[in-house]
Amino acid sequence: MPINQVHRYKAQMLKALAHPVRLLIVEKLLEKEQCVNDIRELVNVSQPNISQHLNTLRFSGIVDFRQQGNLRCYFLRNPQNIKKVLKALE
């Protein structure tokens, strides 16, 4: 069976979730949309580090953001898929 786009998407998603900080960010975003400063306080890591993790999640198609003035607020693009993945890990 050849590798197709669906396999690549799933692998990319799992790879992006395979870091404790990113996993915590995703769990917090399951609760509600969060702005960058809120996320930084919740996970207690530096601003540049948070930005790097959020970019990884965004480029993997897991999160997206909306601009509120000077703030970037992040949300999960497909929370149902994330819930399924996290449930499978229990």
Set out the residue ranges of the language-model regions:
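Short, Lys/Arg-enriched N-terminal segment that forms or immediately precedes the first helix
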Residues: M1-L14
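Conserved segment of winged-helix/HTH DNA-binding domains
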Residues: Y9, C73-E90
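Short capping segments at the starts of secondary-structure elements
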Residues: P20, L30-N37
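Helix-turn-helix DNA-binding motif, specifically the short coil turn and the N-cap/start of the second
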Residues: C35, S46-N49
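Alpha-helical residues within the helix-turn-helix
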Residues: R40-E41, Q52, R58-F59
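Beta-hairpin "wing" of winged helix-turn-helix
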Residues: F59-G69, F75
